[in-house]
Amino acid sequence: MEDIIVKKKYEFTYATIEVDGRTLYRIRALRDFGNVKKGDLGGLIEHEGNLSHDGNCWVDDNALVYGDAKAYGNARVFDNAQVYDNAHVRS
């Protein structure tokens, strides 16, 4: 069986905020996908488990995803939305 390698689509920047005792990091796109262009700044996430590198999902603007929450598929979390605890967002 062939292994599928997914190229990372974002990285963490040094811009952070504290929410509920957790450190969230602003993300930056590493490649073009969907409506996102390489270099675009996104919203803030706590860890890589919050936003899949697959699909066109993205956290944008001042949106937050943290805790055990996850955005995947083609979901877009934007404006001032907050996704946290065990919530999953998929489109």
Language-model features and meaning:
Residues 1-56:
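Terminal amphipathic alpha-helical/low-complexity segments used for targeting or macromolecular assembly
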Residues 52-91:
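A detector of tandem-repeat and repeat-rich interaction/domain scaffolds
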